[in-house]
């Protein structure tokens, strides 16, 4: 009921825009309903989606931190980049 009201309002705005010469809205994309007004079926929901994201992001962060730490140690051991103590103004 509410969705059909929204579709009607958009159609009115679309027709009003074309009458005044505005071609901003060319096509109405219906995400939730078919042209007949029937509701589309619910999309497939992946179970444990948030858990999958967490199980993907956390190992990626840990691996990235390990690689960064190893690279920093390598650069410091080979004297390619040694942080100077003059930059520390924590007195």
UniProtKB/Swiss-Prot annotation:
How is it placed in the membrane, per its record?
Single-pass membrane protein
Gene Ontology biological-process entries? calcium import into the mitochondrion; mitochondrial calcium ion homeostasis
Keywords per UniProt? Calcium, Calcium transport, Ion transport, Membrane, Mitochondrion, Mitochondrion inner membrane, Transit peptide, Transmembrane, Transmembrane helix, Transport
Question: What cystine pairs are annotated?
Answer: none
Main location per UniProt? mitochondrion
TM spans (from-to): 45-65
Domain of life of the source:
Eukaryota
What the entry lists under InterPro entries is as follows:
MCU_reg
User: Record's Gene Ontology CC terms?
Assistant: uniplex complex
> Where, per UniProt, does this protein localize?
Mitochondrion inner membrane
Record keyword Cell membrane present: no
User: What's this protein's family per the entry?
Assistant: Belongs to the SMDT1/EMRE family.
Q: What does this protein do?
A: Essential regulatory subunit of the mitochondrial calcium uniporter (mcu) channel, a protein that mediates calcium uptake into mitochondria.
UniProt-recorded name of the protein: Essential MCU regulator, mitochondrial
Which organism does this record belong to? Aedes aegypti
């Amino acid at each position: 009921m509410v969705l059909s009201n929204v579709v009607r309002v958009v159609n009115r705005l679309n027709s009003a825009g074309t009458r005044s010469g505005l071609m901003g809205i060319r096509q109405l994309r219906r995400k939730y309903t078919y042209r007949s007004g029937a509701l589309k079926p619910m999309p497939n929901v992946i179970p444990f989606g948030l858990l999958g994201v967490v199980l993907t992001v956390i190992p990626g962060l840990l691996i990235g931190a390990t690689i960064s730490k190893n690279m920093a140690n390598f650069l410091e051991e080979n004297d390619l980049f040694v942080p100077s103590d003059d930059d520390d103004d924590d007195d």
